[in-house]
Each structure stands twice: as structure tokens, then as C-alpha cells.
Amino acid sequence: MDEKVKVTDTEPTDKKVNEDTTLKEKLVEAECMEADMPEQSEEQDGTGAEETTSYLPLAADQLDLAKQYKQMMLFYEAGIRQLTTKLQILNREFEQSNDRNPIENIKSRIKSAESIAKKMKRKGLPMTLSCLTNNIYDIAGIRVICPFITDVYEVARMLLSQTDVELVQVKDYIREPKENGYRSLHLIVKINVFFSDGMRQVPVEVQMRTIAMNFWASTEHQLRYKKDKVITSEMHARLKKCADIMADADYQMQKLAEEIHF
């Protein structure tokens, strides 16, 4: 159960990787490599001979990194697919028993190579793929949007009751909001995914929040990261006030739901 998703760093056989080349640069290269590589095309030149489009061969270290990176992304994509399917089944099961859905929406994403490299640098981690897979657990992410606060915790309970889902970490920003007013339930889980060569435990971050929490978080993110504008302390205070208003609306809706036995 302690097995982790690992991608082994392979020493290039043709030449040593330049020490000044950062993981960020290499990951971005690997991420873009397949899109940039032209496909072979065949045309008749009138003489019956075939012309094949040629391109410069990639260095051995680039090919090796691209292969490892693609394999790593396959693991995380599979983890997202499997976890999403579980959530959809639990949502349908709950609907059959309660005549309503506890999940409003499910979204997923995989961090870009640039975002991964920035996070590793911020954490002071060695820029290697093996270190990445053993220390960064939010490369694959799922966001679950629920109507009510109680739905958030019920869906989390149902998910964690699955025997092939292991809880790694929980951060409850609903009961203990961040200073800026952010509210959400964050889970890091490992899910068993079976491949042709065996089973792997894939880490996935699951963010669970209400519709109101998601509205505030999404809008606040757009405002905060407007690059050509400066967010003043007064604006931060207003954003925090909006978060508190949304939280109060959540609790009022929850009380109404309980009063009418929803």
C-alpha cells in the first residue's frame, strides 16, 4: 500500500545532460516534443520514387526524457479517469436513494510542466523526475462541486470508504478557512490503477467545495492574478468580506435544507 508512482531517471547513453539545463526546460521540451515533431509523409514524384519528410534527430537524453514524461502523464491521467468514474458512480447511487445529487459538477486537470517545475523550485526540491513523483502529490487534480456543505463531507466519506482509495492528507479549509477567506476541503488520495505490468498507486488531489465557495474562489483567482493591476489591502479586505458573505449564504441554505428535510 506504500508503493508510489515512480519514474526512474535513466542516465543518457550518448551524452551527459548539461548540468545547467533545468528540469523546467527539459519538461517543457518533453511536453512540446510530440506536437513539434513532424510526421513522415510520402508523395509520388512522378518517377515512382517516394519522398519522405526528414527532420533533425533528437538527442538521446531528450528521447529518454520524453518517454519518461509521457509515461508519467499516462499514470496521472489514468488516476484521474478512475477516480472520476468512482465519483460518478457514488453520485448516481446517492441519487437513487435520496432523489437528488450530492455532486453538481466534476472537473479535472493535470499540472503543466512549467507549473510543476516552479513548485519544485519553491519547495527547494532537486530537479529530477523521481523526486517529482515522490514529493509532488497534486500533479493530478479533481475538483468536486456540491450543493450543500453536508454534501461535501458525505461525498468525501463515501469516497474514502472505497478499499482501493487511500487517504494521504486532508486539509479542511471549510472548518478553518484561510486568512483570505478561501474555503474548501482538500484531500490527497492514492488510487489503485492497474496497467499491463501491474498495479500502481497514483496520487490525486481532490478539492471539494460548495457552489458558493467555488464561485468566490474562481472569481477571486481571476481578480488577484490580473497582472496589470495592483490589488490593494482595501481590496483584499473587500474580497475577504465577500467570502464571509458567501459562507453565511452557504450556512443559511444548509439550515433551510435541514428544516425542510431535504
Locate each region found by the language model.
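Generic alpha-helical secondary structure
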Residues: M72, Y76, I80, A113, ...
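Glycine-rich, low-complexity intrinsically disordered segments
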Residues: M73-F75, P102-S108, L132-T133, I145
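Surface-exposed, low-hydrophobicity interaction/linker segments
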Residues: G79-I80, T84, Q88-L125
